Amino acid sequence: MSNWGDYENEIYGQGLVGVAPTLPMSYADWEAHAQQALPPGVLSYVAGGSGDEHTQRANVEAFKHWGLMPRMLMAATERDLSVELWGKTWAAPMFFAPIGVIALCAQDGHGDAASAQASARTGVPYITSTLAVSSLEDIRKHAGDTPAYFQLYYPEDRDLAESFIRRAEEAGYDGLVITLDTWIFGWRPRDLTISNFPFLRGLCLTNYVTDPVFQKKFKAHSGVEAEGLRDNPRLAADFWHGLFGHSVTWEDIDWVRSITKMPVILKGIQHPDDARRAVDSGVDGIYCSNHGGRQANGGLPALDCLPEVVKASGDTPVLFDSGIRTGADVVKALAMGASAVGIGRPYAWGAALGGSKGIEHVARSLLAEADLIMAVDGYRNLKELTIDALRPTR
């Protein structure tokens, strides 16, 4: 049996034959190097948060308020980090969270395909965004046998929503993640300062311009055939923007649940009452997240919301993201009750540094650190990693 921590031995072994790492090993260095590699507009979009970015910073700081209590003499030579979710075996309790501009983070402009390829090689599941350069069908092919999930920005037009859902089903996605907190754009000073919003420029809209329902409605609206969508991305962007502004309701979730057998996961849940109602409505998963502090400033760190959301969700799996920067953060979120933990900015920086290989390196580095922490601290599997393993440091 191999452990994720073996990546450490691989790196040291290469050093013995004179091969030094070409990619940095820590979040701070990933970010610093990526800042030199990315265009200003992409960098501001990925790095920025809402308002004065207090919530974004608080997401990260929250992890420092908890420490893992070590247990000795536990025979943790081998660790099992696999997890069963929605009928699929995940090789690790970590996933690539959806990022709308991940395509633009890679030097070749195809970071979404690169993410799926890294997913296939590592076994770390990928949640692909509706906003992508590659089509959702192509991205699913790149992910291979690794579980993959489609994230939906729910449009106000149900015909279009159903079209996306049917396409995801036919492409072989293993579940549907509905984002709840991005029906309107948060106040993001970094982007506003340079008047930059990539999607209004027609970027990352491939899933829309290739969709038959979108094409039909666009033609009825403008008289332009589908070919015109590809030739004039600004026209497509204007029409796309008009589809936003619909705040997702419980009735919408009931409707989605009625038309698909795919597992349905709700992203953006932070209040325990919302988690309870979601479970009662029949959804298959809860995704505790505050969008990395990108949508609403002045809120709680997502980690502070996690324990109550987990408790309210009962046996329903709970995914988590927001503020993950290290393998230690991954371990702490799992101990707080997350079924699996999503990374966002770390793999965006990886895409900037080395495309698919950079993303793979980031994932393997985080999982190696998490695995080695569990080894040193005496936790052999995820069942042993509970909230009782944590102590407050403040």
Swiss-Prot record:
Which one Pfam family would you cite for this protein? Answer: FMN_dh
S-adenosyl-L-methionine is among the record's keywords: no
The Enzyme Commission number assigned here is: 1.13.12.4
| Keywords on record | Flavoprotein, FMN, Monooxygenase, Oxidoreductase
Residues reported to bind a 2-oxocarboxylate? 45, 153, 188, 294
What's the superkingdom here? Bacteria
Please give the cofactor(s) recorded in the UniProt entry for this protein.
FMN
Could you give the cofactor binding note from the entry?
A: Binds 1 FMN per subunit.
GO MF annotation list: FMN binding; lactate 2-monooxygenase activity
What positions constitute the catalytic site?
291
Does Oxidoreductase show up as a keyword for this record?
A: yes
Q: What class of enzyme is it?
A: oxidoreductase
**Reaction equations catalysed:** (S)-lactate + O2 = acetate + CO2 + H2O
Q: How does it assemble?
A: Homotetramer.
What other note does the entry give for this protein?
This enzyme proceeds along a 'coupled pathway', wherein rather than releasing the alpha-keto-acid as a product (in this case pyruvate), it remains in the active site, and after reaction with hydrogen peroxide undergoes an oxidative decarboxylation to produce acetate, carbon dioxide, and water.
Give the record's family classification. Belongs to the FMN-dependent alpha-hydroxy acid dehydrogenase family.
Main function:
Catalyzes the oxidative decarboxylation of (S)-lactate (L-lactate) to acetate and carbon dioxide. Its physiological role remains unknown.
Q: This chain belongs to which protein, by name?
A: L-lactate 2-monooxygenase
The upper taxonomy is: Bacteria, Bacillati, Actinomycetota, Actinomycetes, Mycobacteriales
